Amino acid sequence: GQGNVNNVWNYATAVANLFPELEITMRNVEFNVELDDDGCMPFRARKCLGESRLDMIPACDGEFGSILRIYREWKYTGDDEFLKGIWDNMMKALEFSIKEWDTDGDGVLDGKMHVTYDIEFYGPNTMTNTIYLGAIKGVVEMAEHLGKQDIADKYRALYEKASVLVDEKLFNGEYYIQELEDVDAYRYQYGIGCLTDQLLGQFMAQAAGLGYVLPKEHVKKALQSIYKYNFKECMDDVPNVQRTYALNDEAGLVLCSWPKGGRPRFPFAYCDEVWTGVEYQVAVTMIKEGMIEEAFTIIKAIRDRYDGYKRCPWSETEAGHHYIRPMSSYSLIPTLAGYSCDMVNKTMSFAPVINEKDYTTFWINGKGWGTYHQTIDDKGEVKKEVTVLYGNIDDVKVE
């Protein structure tokens, strides 16, 4: 492919953090070059490479994800001109996407949704709905900033309604499921299975600074269930007829399991595979919920597999070498540091979740980069030192 598949880039956070201006060019290509007059976005960008536009159905997770990432890029850089220049086409894409995938107009996506597993999901599920919730939550804030209060009010009402409905429909007490009357009516579904990517939009929303899109207590319970059911200490007993990214006595987080039965006759083909890009995003979300031990166990399993002996530690393979999905790993750095930045409101803050008494980390945003050092003495006095190695953050409040 061209290396720009929008739903795979949902996971990757390294470029957005380290080179935000470069990431912005991707949003401009998606919305100002590739988008058609109806608001439909191809999931691969080809026109910018001098090729014909991709003639395939759009990706639900990718199109909503690109909208959410507009919010992220805006927050990382504080670039209002970028937001103004992309706004009209972003709204065109949003309106198309809601009409395309919320078929009954109740606020919950339920249509035929092409996703990153190279198949279509049917019916409500939280993999796509959390991304959608993050996108419309971000639109509310962007609209308010631009003085478009009618739009903000419209999508705030939709968000508040949809967030409640998604949770009520899909949370089974342990994790979020896919709602289908007959899981075998369509091939490649997961039904009442425990999908590792069920909180993908939550990961994306938190990486962008949007907070929760589903109830905090249900998010944590779902993460506990993902770890309980999908983390395998040994892959020996996991039948897998697809690609082998973990095997024998290696550990890993499979993409889906069916702890309550109900495995479809033809589940989505990759369900028994292990993808590092998914493992990292789950680990990051776990850290947000205080599940440090579980997160580190997953990360260690990845690094044990890519140990430089069995596999190259610099090329975590999926649909090829140096695949972009594992760039979700970058989010470990700001998440462990409890780092957040908002260059629109010119604030940045730190709240390390490990080694709090003596912690040093790297920080970066659209204004500059440097280091942060924190110490806590025996009396509980906290000392914080922010060093700027490039750029200027004189107008940024450090909290």
Question: What is the predicted function of each stretch?
Answer:
Residues G1, P20-I57, K99-P124, D167-W275, ...:
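Extended glycan-interaction surfaces of carbohydrate-active proteins
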Residues G1-V166, A207:
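Substrate-binding cleft of carbohydrate-active enzyme catalytic domains
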Residues T25, G85, L214-K216, D394-K397:
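Short helix/loop capping segments that flank catalytic or ligand/cofactor-binding pockets
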Residues D88-K92, A222-S225, K300-D304:
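Amphipathic alpha-helical scaffolding segments
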Residues A246-A251, F268, D272-E273, E279-E399:
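Non-catalytic C-terminal accessory modules of carbohydrate-active enzymes
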